[in-house]
From Swiss-Prot:
Domain of life: Bacteria
NCBIfam families: hslU, PRK05201.1
GO terms of molecular function: ATP binding; ATP hydrolysis activity; peptidase activity; proteasome-activating activity
Stated name of the protein: ATP-dependent protease ATPase subunit HslU
Length: 436
């Protein structure tokens, strides 16, 4: 399922969305390519080659999460992002780390199901069309009548005609799962009625709708009939095992500093629970067993207070590739505003265009935005590129609010407008702490 790219192509694709951080991009590109290389191997060697997990070190807002998320999207791989601080040691109240893998399996099933739906889309559309014709002319209509109505249907003449359709009521069979204390993963034994009795428990729901609006639910219904659920689950488990990517953020927050006494529930215990996951173990899910040996783990943290060596030595050894991401400079922030395919400025211009308002942002305005963001990051708290969103929202606040009343007009935003909108707030440190 994973799409194959060379490391150079991966870095080039990441460059379209993320500015700078070439070392991190190279590391994840090599890690992704190594997966493909491993899958080409035969025999025992294939099982022996383990992924080289990555530890990204850098302040917030410099692109750590963005790189991992884009990598997974690029590869078409199941991806789950978790925060290390959300988990507690097994035996305490809270989420245990095995839930990470269960979430990954759920995402893999969704990905595989969508892929299989695309494969049967044409057949499902044909079947849906037949059901619409049944609703229009009845199942006993002559072939000539059906052909006549089929022609009108395809030409859109019947789009607004109301019909009644029967579709499966999926909500009635939704699973009710919950954790049993002291039994991690116990929800795997609790299954909904449709899983136990097959389609016996499924209910039919009658809906009144127009011909045009009937196609989507009917195509979904027909797609489900054409899909082999067991095959989807087996393929999803394989995809999660071989292509899955787990991004563990804020891992520095569970690092125990020398001599530090913390009231938090065993940070070291969470690290110890992560060890078998990262090294390779078997996790029980309600869909079956899944091995974590070949899942790629990318951990990240700012390490402002703690340092990577404060992590358990065993966990450090399971994150062999270290990548330091650089704080963003003024030039980086300027490029972030303009260069990515969906840059902030392009987003705001597109949003205002929906109100028929033309937005023009000059080069000196972009310089001013970058200067203010750098200044605020230096004086208050360095939150990286995220500061740009705060500054942009403040600058465009009035235009966004009045846009519906200004259809057909143009706004030119220059450096003077930026400073007028935000200058006093940026200068007042007490105010900017709360507003910017």
């Amino acid at each position: 399922m994973c799409i194959v790219f060379s490391p150079r192509e991966i870095v080039s694709e990441l460059d379209r969305f993320i500015i700078g951080q070439n070392d991190a991009k190279r590391s994840v590109a090599i890690a992704l390519r190594n997966r493909w290389r491993r899958q080409q191997l035969d025999g025992p060697m294939r099982e022996e080659v383990m992924p080289k997990n990555i530890l990204m070190i850098g302040p917030t807002g410099v692109g750590k999460t963005g790189i991992a998320r884009r990598l997974a999207k690029l590869a078409g791989a199941p991806f789950v992002k978790v925060e290390a601080t959300k988990f507690t040691e097994v035996g305490y109240v809270g989420r245990d780390v095995e839930q990470i893998i269960r979430d990954l399996v759920e995402i893999a099933i969704s990905l595989v199901r969508e892929k299989k739906r695309d494969e049967v889309k044409v057949k499902a559309h044909i079947n849906a069309e037949e059901r619409v014709l049944d609703a229009l002319v009845g199942k006993t209509a002559s072939p000539a009548t059906r052909d006549s109505f089929r022609k009108k249907l395809r030409e859109g003449e019947l789009d607004e005609k109301e019909i009644e359709i029967e579709v499966a009521d999926n909500n009635s069979n939704s699973a009710s799962t919950f954790d049993i204390p002291g039994m991690p993963g116990a929800q795997m034994g609790i299954m909904n009625l449709s899983e136990i009795f097959g389609k016996m428990g499924s209910r039919i729901k009658v809906r009144k709708t127009t011909v045009k609006d009937s196609f989507k639910p009917l195509i979904d219904d027909e797609s489900e009939k054409l899909l082999d659920q067991d095959q989807i689950i087996q393929e999803a488990l394989r995809v999660a095992e071989n292509d899955g990517i787990v991004f563990i953020d804020e891992i520095d927050k569970i690092a125990t500093r020398d001599g530090a006494v913390s009231a938090a529930v065993s940070r070291e215990g969470v690290q110890r629970d992560l060890l078998p996951l990262v090294e390779g173990t078997t996790i029980a899910t309600k869909y079956g067993q899944i091995k974590t040996d070949h899942i790629l783990f990318i951990a990240s943290g700012a390490f402002h207070v703690s340092k990577p060596s404060d992590l358990l030595p065993e966990l450090q050894g399971r994150l062999p590739i270290r990548v330091e991401l650089n704080p963003l400079t003024r030039e980086d922030l300027r490029r972030i505003l303009t260069e990515p395919e969906a840059s902030l400025i392009k987003q705001y211009i597109a949003l205002m265009a929906m109100e028929e308002v033309r937005l023009e942002i000059t080069d000196d305005a972009i310089d001013a935005l970058a200067d203010i963001a750098v200044d605020l990051n230096a004086r208050i708290e360095n939150i990286g590129a995220r500061r740009l969103q705060t500054v942009m929202e403040r600058v465009l606040d009035e235009i966004s609010f009045t846009a519906p009343d200004k259809a057909g007009t143009s706004f030119k935003i220059d450096a003077a407008y930026v400073r007028q909108s935000i200058g006093d707030l940026a200068a007042d440190l007490d105010l900017s702490r709360f507003i910017l």
